[in-house]
């Protein structure tokens, strides 16, 4: 399953305990989650950092949909 935000927000995230992705700020990413049962757990564990001009509270509430 591939997830994408339903709104076009740019965000930075940490994939702890996995390797940190070396992405430039405002990079676009596609997150592939193989185990559907883990989707909510993974999304809840993402650390969303405030990036200038982005309302991070709204970002946390963004609905994710499968492609």
UniProtKB/Swiss-Prot annotation:
Keywords: Toxin-antitoxin system. Belongs to the UPF0165 family. Possibly the antitoxin component of a type II toxin-antitoxin (TA) system. This is Putative antitoxin PF1308.
């Amino acid at each position: 399953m591939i997830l994408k935000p339903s709104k076009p927000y740019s965000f930075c995230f940490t994939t702890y305990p996995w390797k940190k992705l070396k992405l430039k700020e405002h990079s676009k990413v596609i997150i592939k989650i193989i185990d559907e049962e883990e989707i909510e757990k993974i999304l809840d564990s993402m650390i969303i950092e405030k990036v200038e001009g982005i309302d991070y509270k709204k970002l946390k509430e963004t609905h994710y949909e499968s492609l």
